[in-house]
Amino acid sequence: MARQIKKSGARKNKHNAVNGITHIKSTFNNTIVTITNLKGETLSWSSSGASGFKGAKKGTPFAAQTAAEKAAKQAMDQGMRQTEVLVNGPGAGRETAIRALQAAGLEITLIKDITPVPHNGCRPPKKRRV
């Protein structure tokens, strides 16, 4: 039987960042949650797709909640306690992801909406006819 060789690849170093920034990008199709330290170095991230949802289910609030819980748990394992939340995008999972971060035990110090709003720039997509 073959022995497994221990790989000496890149290892995740423990950051011990107590404060950080949580970026929530919520689109109509997916929600991506990235937790960084104050410098902007990523500590943990998760998305609806990475949490096991596929297709149209990725855009649901429950998928966003699952992604936020997963990212928050990883960040708290690295010592994070407080976070600022920057929300971006028009998706369904915005509020649910913030509530999931609070429920996971992270103290939220600031919630800021950084969704870019055009000064009448590009033409939006046409309305769906179902």
Swiss-Prot record:
GO cellular component: chloroplast; ribonucleoprotein complex; ribosome
PROSITE patterns: RIBOSOMAL_S11
Keyword set includes Metal-binding: no
Domain of life from the UniProt record: Eukaryota
Classification via InterPro entries: Ribosomal_uS11 (IPR001971), Ribosomal_uS11_bac-type (IPR019981), Ribosomal_uS11_CS (IPR018102), Ribosomal_uS11_sf (IPR036967)
Keyword Acetylation: no
Subcellular location: Plastid, Chloroplast
Annotated keywords: Chloroplast, Plastid, Ribonucleoprotein, Ribosomal protein, RNA-binding, rRNA-binding
One Gene Ontology molecular-function label: rRNA binding
One Pfam family per UniProt: Ribosomal_S11
GO biological process: translation
Main localisation: plastid
Subunit structure: Part of the 30S ribosomal subunit.
HAMAP family: Ribosomal_uS11
Family: Belongs to the universal ribosomal protein uS11 family.
Name recorded for this polypeptide: Small ribosomal subunit protein uS11c
Taxon lineage: Eukaryota, Rhodophyta, Bangiophyceae, Bangiales, Bangiaceae
